[in-house]
């Protein structure tokens, strides 16, 4: 082997071997335990960044470790390839989205291969491939048939320049994230998936995912937002109409003094009197320009407008003015809030601003609240007052009694409410999966017959940058005969939200070549669920919740048998440099290509895994990268130095080992135990690598290396180092393994076996205290008696001064740990 470690030579050699031999190609094998490992697939933006390097290196360690442990590992890679950036690039660079996307995929694939990642590339998929999205169209039609896909009118975030719907996350300070135009609220017909049908199950199963971070589960529970309360009808004064309210605080009903409606509420204009109409319409227009997240923020100024109408509190008969309020949303509860300013902080601020009445109905223990003197709302449990027959009860006890009373009187009903809303999937963009629906003036909404699938996304479109979908302007796509009556009809021009594609890709990886449907049930049965999923915390709610929903929906459609897609979830931290997340705008980006060209992929991997535990942020350090390279060079030199002495002398004979050889073997097996536990149980790759580094130091220090009797111990030690390092740095370890005389690759060797007898310490370090204070430490044999421990302690030079000339009262011995000498 070469004397000097030259990463490029080593890495190019082994990458070529892996590719030619399809080393990581995998098929179903019932004789082996399966392990499905997956990192969230990337958007093909053009180049990988250091976040990708870290994320995929984490996954690769797990995959390689599991293979060494005898698992049949599925570790695929693909591309989340539809989406708006490709259209933006088409407009800016006069390049078709398909060309831009596939060129990016080709480059990024080459980058990932240079990292030495153990993917089964035969399973690669891109969501913009017809072979992928055609099956998604079939699933859509089946969901439509089951009532899980439907169309309705709803208010959406709308960018007038891009002419498309924006998710809440794409609205930044009231502006479009892409073009910075002011976002408005627009009423639009959209396609939805009925995720709310699964709200209860999605919530229930958060208790059945022990391998998920509690933080993510909490975020999902909050997003689903189950709450118990009542729906209460408030009659509108002078009308037969009623305003329906959902509340979890029916104990405060007697304190409701006004009504707040969402500006989008269907009764908003109906309740507006002629003299108030101009002001109300101006207010509604203003609120439409504010995104929902900002409207519900605690620090956002609460504003409203009086409609001119009143409703009646059904238990007090109080006249309640009806306001529109900017902080009330139509898609939570009923879009109407009974305002109790004394016991809700937002209502309190609103009431003070518009000089509305306050009525205390819950008093703190031993205190009397004066509405005029209140500086904040009282929101804790207390004693009911001004609440009719419920006076004197604790407010938490009164909740159930008031709910029963409302039901008995026909005023309200007990209700369970969910914050979760159905998933709007319509996007007014070109580069996405066409929704397979046709609109006929005679037949109405007509699903595309399965025999006519797929609806192919046409390539001959023009990108003008004017906004809206180019599909709308393509007559050859839009104008089609109705499948039912044959009359000319119009094709749907909206495409599906890209979250749809990422909600089932992990299932298609099980059978990417399956030509008879979206999913081969038998193969999915073998591989699913994903044993380990790895990705960023930013996907905690949307992607992960949608993927859970889709899995359950596909289960109910008969495609899969699992209830959940991902058994275990790791959310890795960010890569930061100079105190901030790496980004082009901050000028603190490290280019992986440059790093790999200079140091090699193994060094890049080792640093990204050693610098911090996976779930923590990684602080970039040039010195750390250099240190990782030096360590690999050091291991290389060590193998070179040991080649004349290893592989000779047969198996280790424990009985004939010298003390030093026994000590080295003890270090080897302690390291095997620690590294195994750190990878398998904790994903503490940084401490696993640190333990291997310590073992390398111990091998360097071991002498004499050239003694024939030490050959077996040195062989076991250096081979264990190479195998344990191989999941982290696969190229250099394959080269070293070959240099050590092995054929068939590291994986064929299997993970080193831990020998408990070899790891047992022959000596203990005993802490010696005198009158409870640390005065020394002594080393004794593991089989030393209590008397031998005492003798060693009394003879210790550091302990002697504290006991000489003093009366020994007693000595308390904790075996193997501590001796406390009590003197007087």
Curated annotation (Swiss-Prot):
ATP binds at residue 584. Transmembrane segments: none annotated. GO terms for biological process: leucyl-tRNA aminoacylation. It is found in: Cytoplasm. It holds the Pfam family tRNA-synt_1_2. Its EC number is 6.1.1.4. Signal peptide: none annotated. SUPFAM superfamilies: Anticodon-binding domain of a subclass of class I aminoacyl-tRNA synthetases (SSF47323), Nucleotidylyl transferase (SSF52374), ValRS/IleRS/LeuRS editing domain (SSF50677). A motif ('HIGH' region) lies at residues 42-52. Its main location: cytoplasm. InterPro entries: aa-tRNA-synth_I_CS, aa-tRNA-synth_Ia, Leu-tRNA-ligase, Leu_tRNA-synth_edit, M/V/L/I-tRNA-synth_anticd-bd, Methionyl/Leucyl_tRNA_Synth, Rossmann-like_a/b/a_fold, tRNAsynth_Ia_anticodon-bd. GO terms for cellular component: cytosol. It catalyses: tRNA(Leu) + L-leucine + ATP = L-leucyl-tRNA(Leu) + AMP + diphosphate. A motif ('KMSKS' region) lies at residues 581-585. GO terms for molecular function: aminoacyl-tRNA deacylase activity; ATP binding; leucine-tRNA ligase activity. Belongs to the class-I aminoacyl-tRNA synthetase family. This is Leucine--tRNA ligase. It comes from Geobacter metallireducens (strain ATCC 53774 / DSM 7210 / GS-15). The lineage of its organism: Bacteria, Pseudomonadati, Thermodesulfobacteriota, Desulfuromonadia, Geobacterales. The gene is leuS.
């Amino acid at each position: 082997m070469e004397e000097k470690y030259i990463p490029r030579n080593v890495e190019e050699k082994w990458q070529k071997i892996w590719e030619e031999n399809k080393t990581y190609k995998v098929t179903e094998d019932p004789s082996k335990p399966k392990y499905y490992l997956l990192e969230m697939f990337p958007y093909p933006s053009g180049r990988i960044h250091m976040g990708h390097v870290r994320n995929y290196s984490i996954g690769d360690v797990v995959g390689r470790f599991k293979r060494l442990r005898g698992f049949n590992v599925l570790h695929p890679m693909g591309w989340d390839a539809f989406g708006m950036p490709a259209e933006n690039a088409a407009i800016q660079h006069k390049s078709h989205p398909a060309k831009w996307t596939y060129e990016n995929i080709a480059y990024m694939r080459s980058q990932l291969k240079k990292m030495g990642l153990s993917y089964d590339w035969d399973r690669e998929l891109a969501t913009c491939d017809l072979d992928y999205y055609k099956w998604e169209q079939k699933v859509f039609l089946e969901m439509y048939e089951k009532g899980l896909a439907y169309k309705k009118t709803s208010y959406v975030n709308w960018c007038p320049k891009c002419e498309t719907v924006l998710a809440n996350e794409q609205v930044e300070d009231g502006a479009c994230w892409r073009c910075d135009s002011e976002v408005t609220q627009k009423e639009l017909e959209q396609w939805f998936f009925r995720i709310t049908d699964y709200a209860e199950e999605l919530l229930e199963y958060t208790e059945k995912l022990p391998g998920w971070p509690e933080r993510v589960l909490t975020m999902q529970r909050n997003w689903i937002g189950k709450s118990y309360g009542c729906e209460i009808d408030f009659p509108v004064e002078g009308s037969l109409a009623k305003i329906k309210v959902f509340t979890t605080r029916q104990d405060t009903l007697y304190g409701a003094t006004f009504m707040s409606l969402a500006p989008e509420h269907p009764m908003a204009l109906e309740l507006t009197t002629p003299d108030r109409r101009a002001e109300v319409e101006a207010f509604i227009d203003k609120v439409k320009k504010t995104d929902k997240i900002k409207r519900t923020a605690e620090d956002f100024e609460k504003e409203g407008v009086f409609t001119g109408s009143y409703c009646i509190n059904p238990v007090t008969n109080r006249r309640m003015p009806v306001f529109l309020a900017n902080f009330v949303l139509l898609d939570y509860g009923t879009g109407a809030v009974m305002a109790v300013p004394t016991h809700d902080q937002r209502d309190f601020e609103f009431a003070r601003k518009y000089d509305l009445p306050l009525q205390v109905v819950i008093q703190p223990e031993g205190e009397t609240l004066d509405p005029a003197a209140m500086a904040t709302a009282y929101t804790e449990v207390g004693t009911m007052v001004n609440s009719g027959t419920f006076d004197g009860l604790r407010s938490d006890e009164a909740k159930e009694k008031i709910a029963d009373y409302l039901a008995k009187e026909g005023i309200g009903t007990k209700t369970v409410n969910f914050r979760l809303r159905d998933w709007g999937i319509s996007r007014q963009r070109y580069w996405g999966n066409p929704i397979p629906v046709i609109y006929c003036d005679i037949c109405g909404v007509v699903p595309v017959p399965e025999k006519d699938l797929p609806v192919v996304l046409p390539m001959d479109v023009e990108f003008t940058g004017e906004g809206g979908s180019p599909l709308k302007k393509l007559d050859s796509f839009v104008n089609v005969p109705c499948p039912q009556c044959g009359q000319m009809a119009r094709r749907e021009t909206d495409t599906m939200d890209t979250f749809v594609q990422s909600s089932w890709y992990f299932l298609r990886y099980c059978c990417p070549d399956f030509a008879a449907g979206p999913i081969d049930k038998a193969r999915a049965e073998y591989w699913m669920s994903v044993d380990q999923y790895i990705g960023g915390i930013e996907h905690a709610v949307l992607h992960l919740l949608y993927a859970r929903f889709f899995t359950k929906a596909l289960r109910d459609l008969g495609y899969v048998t699992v209830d959940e897609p991902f058994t275990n979830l790791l959310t890795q931290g960010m890569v930061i440099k100079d105190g901030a997340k790496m980004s082009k705008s901050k000028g603190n980006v490290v280019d992986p290509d440059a790093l790999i060209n200079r140091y090699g992929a193994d060094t890049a991997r080792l640093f990204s895994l050693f610098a911090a535990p996976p779930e923590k942020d990684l602080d970039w350090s040039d010195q750390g990268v250099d240190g990782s390279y030096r360590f690999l060079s050091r291991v290389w030199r060590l193998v070179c130095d040991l080649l004349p002495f290893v592989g000779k002398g047969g198996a280790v004979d424990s009985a004939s080992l010298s003390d030093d050889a026994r000590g080295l073997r003890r270090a080897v097996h302690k390291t095997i135990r620690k590294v195994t536990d750190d990878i398998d149980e904790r994903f503490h790759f940084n401490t696993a690598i640190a333990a291997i580094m310590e073992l390398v130091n111990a091998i360097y220090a071991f002498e004499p290396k050239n003694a024939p009797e030490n050959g077996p111990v040195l062989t076991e030690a250096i081979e264990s180092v190479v195998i344990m390092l191989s999941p982290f740095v696969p190229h250099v370890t394959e080269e070293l393994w070959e240099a050590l005389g092995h054929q068939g690759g590291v994986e064929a060797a299997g993970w080193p076996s831990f020998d408990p007898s070899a790891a047992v310490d022959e000596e203990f370090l005993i802490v010696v205290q005198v009158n409870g204070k640390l005065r020394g430490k002594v080393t004794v044999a593991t089989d030393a008696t209590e008397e031998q421990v005492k003798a060693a302690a009394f003879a210790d030079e550091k302990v002697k001064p504290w006991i000489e000339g003093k009366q020994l009262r007693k000595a308390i011995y904790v075996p193997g740990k501590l001796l406390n000498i009590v003197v007087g």
